[in-house]
Amino acid sequence: MANTETTINAVINPQLNDTPIDIEKTIKALERNKFVVNYFETGVEAVDYLQSRIQDKSVAIGDSRTLMELKVHDALSEVNKDITDIQRPLPGESFRDTALRTMGREVFLTSVNALAQTGEMVNIDGTGNRVAASRFGSQEVFFVLGRNKITPDLASAIYRARNVAAPLNSKKNKKSSLNPCAKLEEKCYDCGSPDRICNALTIYYKKMRNMQTMEVIIINEDLGF
């Protein structure tokens, strides 16, 4: 694990833009909540670690711009034969069937929309498959995120998920790109759109019971939304 005595800035909201984020404090808070934590200066180091850590397992990868940017699928494919990726369905396979295959794998990887310096993580979902797989079914879950996801506290983490991550995620999808948060100012309008991507908000307070490991990988780079 790289040196954690680092202070970085995270984009949260206009009022908190200049709030310094203490990585060491964040790691200690996560560890108090029974999460395993590893910190890396670069994405390359983090992917090398994941490749050495996850071998000969049944693996599922949730929808995550961070994991796509890091090319985690390609790296893990070199050392694991059984990989289900929500972004890579089998020919003719429905989204639902692909999502169901991500459940119950030995290992599940995803990211988070926000990580509070106080040790909680936040994810927001439209369909719910990502947060479902991250909370139950796998023996080990890895949350991989960049420094830009870190916020001072839980309230600002929820703010970030709703007003920063959700609008950016809406823009990347053809249907959800018509949502107000994607077309207008980037913020939550609490809309009633059928293609709304923020129907459920999950707060990870502590490691789930009966799960072997919930590990948080923090990278000192801006990654994902």
Where are these regions (language model features)?
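Short N-terminal helix-initiation segments at or just after the protein's N-terminus
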Residues: A2-E5, T84-P91, E221-L223
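Conserved phosphate- and dinucleotide-binding cores of soluble alpha/beta proteins
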Residues: M103-F225
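A near-ubiquitous, low-amplitude feature marking generic local secondary-structure context
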Residues: T6-N9, N13, A29, N33, ...
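Short, mixed-charge, low-aromatic patches
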Residues: M1-T7, L30, P89, L109-T118
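N-terminal active-site beta-alpha-beta segment that forms phosphate/nucleotide-binding
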Residues: T19, I23-A99, G104-L109
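Short linear motifs at secondary-structure transitions and domain/linker junctions
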Residues: V11-Q15, K34-V37, D82-L90, D97-L100, ...
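Iron-sulfur (Fe-S) cluster-binding modules
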Residues: M1-N33, Y49, I54, L168-L178
